[in-house]
Design a protein with these regions (language model features):
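C-terminal, flexible cofactor-proximal segment of oxidoreductases
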Residues: 2-5, 291, 308-389
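Glycine-rich dinucleotide-binding loop and its adjacent helix/turn
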Residues: 2, 103-106, 151-209, 304-318, ...
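Glycine-rich active-site loop/strand segments that organize a redox cofactor
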Residues: 53-108, 216-234
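Short hydrophobic core segments
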Residues: 25-27, 147-159, 193, 279-291
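A conserved short coil-to-beta-strand element within the FAD-binding core of flavoproteins
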Residues: 124-138, 254-266
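N-terminal Rossmann-like FAD-binding beta1-loop-alpha1 element of flavoenzymes
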Residues: 22-49, 191-208
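A Rossmann-like FAD-binding core segment of flavoenzymes
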Residues: 208-302, 359-373
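Short beta-strand "acidic-cap" motif of Rossmann-like dinucleotide-binding folds
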Residues: 46-52, 212-217
Length: 389
């Protein structure tokens, strides 16, 4: 079992851990943090700690009340195929929650249950203020002191770091990640900037409530021919767009980049790069995605041209040994690991690298994870398109 601490996912955090040294500290207690922690347990690594500045699954719990997972859950474990939303072998959100498309709050509760079941050592309400490596040890600064670890897995995700830039006046808009419930929004005429999953989700719920929506995107995600949902819309979103209420109340503006948003006498004025002007008395919604938490540790990684961290085949920093990345910010060449069913396949890669550095035998561990499709080390199989028929 993991090393015991003075708190867990259901208890209060303590500053006593500041005097401890760990083999691994995982920053972030979301799907990636909890999932990679379980992989460490299975690999035989015991002396580790998960820290989160809030609570287990808090980013999921903060999603709009109506927002659901676009990836469906199904209890397919009996035939050796993991539920798409599972973060660990033997677990199926569909089975435990009896829900195909869970809400954020439902999945947060699911993560908390898993953390408790595996007795994972979690220090909640622990905000990492700084990370530096001195000699062979990482020093993680908190309000209560310094945590020491030989390895760090950065799994803080993206949701708490919304992208608020992109055009003049973007600060006048409200990011969709800050909306508690679309049903609670005042106004009858909404301008939504960003037509990928978050934008379509917002438009769906608002139009279902009889609100008028104009949805803008610099591209046209709903027209993409690729089968990769990292680029094109999910099947779940396409189905929603075919609902009568969506067609009646939502007007799409593809290939229409927004140049500015201004506020004039209580009226929001949206201008597009091609000169069109749209007005509304309702604050525009910004669905432009997330900048990601990896910016916080940019000094510990080289940077790709797209701004994401450069990582090795083991998802380790190429300039700071022992610093690993896990979760939706993982990139390898053109492959984007932004969904749970994608980035979970890298948990065991990281766990094996750390376990091997501690001289722990990992052959059986790797075989078990490979048998469940949870060990993706051959990226040549990625990027395959579906047949058109």
């Amino acid at each position: 079992m993991p090393k015991e601490t003075n708190s867990n996912a259901g208890g209060e955090s303590s500053s006593d851990a500041a005097s401890d040294e760990y083999d691994v500290i995982i920053v972030g207690a979301g799907a990636a943090g909890v999932g990679v922690a379980i992989a460490l347990v299975h690999a035989g690594v015991e002396n580790f700690l998960i820290v989160d500045r809030d609570t287990v699954g808090s980013s999921f719990a903060a999603r709009p009340e109506e927002t659901k997972f676009i990836t469906p859950s199904f209890p397919s474990n009996s035939i050796g195929m993991l539920d798409l939303n599972s973060i660990a072998i033997g677990i199926s959100p569909a089975f435990t929650m009896r829900v195909e498309h869970p809400t954020g709050k439902q999945f947060a509760a699911h993560l908390q249950d898993i953390a408790n079941y595996f007795e994972l050592p979690v220090e909640e309400d622990t905000d990492i203020k700084s990370i530096e490596k001195i000699d062979d040890m990482f020093h993680l600064g908190t309000d209560d002191g310094v945590l020491l670890s030989k390895n760090v897995i950065w799994a803080a995700g993206e949701y708490q770091y919304p992208n608020l830039a992109g055009f003049e006046g973007s600060d006048l808009c409200r990011h969709t990640s800050t909306v508690p419930s679309y049903g609670g929004l005042e106004g009858d005429d909404f301008l939504i900037i960003g037509g990928y999953e978050s934008g379509v989700d917002a438009a769906f719920h608002l139009s279902a409530n009889g609100k008028e929506v104009r949805l803008f995107d610099m591209n046209a995600p709903w027209e993409e021919t690729t089968s990769d949902p990292s680029v094109a819309l999910s099947t779940f979103s396409f189905e929603r767009m075919r609902k009568p209420s969506f067609g009646q109340h939502t007007e799409l503006y593809p290939n229409t980049p927004v140049s500015s948003v201004t506020l004039d006498n209580g009226v929001y004025v949206l201008k597009t790069e091609d000169g069109q002007i749209f007005e509304s008395r309702t604050q525009p919604l910004l669905a432009g995605g997330f900048s990601g938490s990896h910016k916080f540790v940019s000094h510990l990684f080289e940077e790709r041209e797209d701004g994401f961290p450069v990582i090795s085949d083991q998802d380790e920093s190429t300039i700071t040994p022992g610093m690993y990345l896990s979760g939706p910010s993982v990139r390898h060449d053109g492959h984007v690991f932004c969904f749970i069913y994608k980035y979970r396949q890298r948990f065991a890669i990281v766990a094996q690298a750390i376990a091997s550095s501690m001289d722990i035998e990992t052959d059986d561990f790797v075989d078990a994870y490979k048998s469940w499709g949870m060990y993706l080390d051959d990226l040549s199989c990625c990027g395959q398109e579906c047949l058109t028929c």
